[in-house]
From Swiss-Prot:
Changing residue 103 to D: In allele DQB1*03:06, allele DQB1*03:25, allele DQB1*04:01, allele DQB1*04:02, allele DQB1*04:03 and allele DQB1*05:04; requires 2 nucleotide substitutions. Glycans are attached at residue 51. The gene is HLA-DQB1. The lineage of its organism: Eukaryota, Metazoa, Chordata, Craniata, Vertebrata. Residues 1-32 form the signal peptide. Changing residue 88 to L: In allele DQB1*03:25, allele DQB1*04:01, allele DQB1*04:02 and allele DQB1*04:03. It is a single-pass type I membrane protein. Changing residue 172 to A: In allele DQB1*02:01, allele DQB1*02:02, allele DQB1*02:04, allele DQB1*05:01, allele DQB1*05:02, allele DQB1*05:03, allele DQB1*06:01, allele DQB1*06:02, allele DQB1*06:03, allele DQB1*06:04, allele DQB1*06:09, allele DQB1*06:12, allele DQB1*06:34, allele DQB1*06:36, allele DQB1*06:38 and allele DQB1*06:39. This is HLA class II histocompatibility antigen, DQ beta 1 chain. It comes from Homo sapiens. Changing residue 35 to P: In allele DQB1*06:01. It is found in: Cell membrane; Endoplasmic reticulum membrane; Golgi apparatus, trans-Golgi network membrane; Endosome membrane. Residues 33-230 are extracellular. Residues 33-126 are annotated as: Beta-1. The keyword Repeat does not apply.
Amino acid sequence: MSWKKALRIPGGLRAATVTLMLAMLSTPVAEGRDSPEDFVYQFKAMCYFTNGTERVRYVTRYIYNREEYARFDSDVEVYRAVTPLGPPDAEYWNSQKEVLERTRAELDTVCRHNYQLELRTTLQRRVEPTVTISPSRTEALNHHNLLVCSVTDFYPAQIKVRWFRNDQEETTGVVSTPLIRNGDWTFQILVMLEMTPQHGDVYTCHVEHPSLQNPITVEWRAQSESAQSKMLSGIGGFVLGLIFLGLGLIIHHRSQKGLLH
């Protein structure tokens, strides 16, 4: 698995970077440029990790007015020009032994160092998702509908959501939202399935995530209107029974108090 991380550069390296920039801007080549009154100079450093620190790549990019003109890549271990603006600076930095050695060392002092810091917080953080299923509207059997599988409050972002109908995976009619950031280091996603439910159909939302030892599966069963009515009637009867039972207990309690007086 590959992982990319923007750098948290230690104070000493930040100072070295600023010194490098100032040195670059003070070189004869830089002085000879016809720079506009307002310009933007950017320095970006990125670490790329594959299978933890099994393979690490360090890339620094130098950008002038939103155009990258030179870079250092740890795979080649020297500065390279990207545009015609880059050769003078790349050649100058490569000629500075101290600059080149320090940049090469940052593969360990920055990338691997930061990886160990992040390992205890960001990289090992796990939050299990909550999964629910709901139809987009109440419809009778044999009518087109949309089932929505809501997968919420999970971290990290990698997740796999699949739909099954009667234990057979559904691949057509599946629509997903982009991954949504909640703003609290968790994510959510909605995965919809277009379907026409038949009596007895069982739809399953199957979710795989790094926080789970086993996938989460949530089922939704297609029911006829008569079955739904019977279920609602049963629930209604149960609630009414509880109400009458409560009233009976209250009346009995009050009558017992009256006899005692």
